[in-house]
Regions:
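HIT superfamily nucleotide-processing domains
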Residues: 1-167
Length: 167
């Protein structure tokens, strides 16, 4: 007999707002020029050609993504200026996360195409995931659960404070 895996249920109060809200008809990375919605959209920083945004469903606390303003699905479609700004914002993300959470390492990556793991295929973005020794604890292994220790709003505020100290 095959074993049926059961989904663990955790209390995650920030998820209800997402679940009950109407689905976006636009790309989550096409943020436009309205900076008044940056906190709501978890935009941490706006560069000249790209921006830093928090992941609403993070692998770890502080999981950031860097995306170009232009809606393209592949790095090869970006200009040299856009590529340079993306990498500058990857570097800034690392600095912000070090200042805020003191991680011991980072995973930095791009998933291009569904088979490569891209959840959003048509707007390329780079993941910056802070890592600590032991952050892959027993919960995902035996309980199929990932524990994120603080609310996204708390993490957002910490990242913005660190950014203001760095810039």
């Amino acid at each position: 007999m095959s074993e049926v895996k059961r989904l663990a249920i955790l209390w995650a109060p920030w998820r209800m707002k997402y679940i009950e809200s109407p689905r976006r008809k636009t790309c989550i990375f096409c943020i436009g020029d309205d900076e008044s919605k940056d906190k709501e959209n978890l935009v941490v920083y706006r560069g000249s050609k790209s921006f830093i945004i928090m992941n609403r469903y993070p692998y770890n606390t502080g999981h950031l993504m860097i995306a170009p303003y232009r809606h393209v699905g592949d790095l090869t479609q970006l200009s040299d200026e856009e590529l340079l700004d993306l990498m500058k914002n990857v570097n800034l993300s690392i600095k912000i996360l070090r200042e805020t959470f003191k991680p011991e390492g980072f995973n930095i990556g791009v998933n291009i195409g569904r088979v490569a793991g891209a959840g959003i295929e048509d707007h390329v973005h780079i993941h910056v995931v802070p890592r600590w020794a032991g952050d892959t604890n027993f919960m995902p292994t035996i309980a199929q659960v990932k524990v994120i220790p603080e609310l996204l709003e708390t993490t957002y505020n910490k990242l913005k404070e660190a950014l203001s100290r760095l810039t």
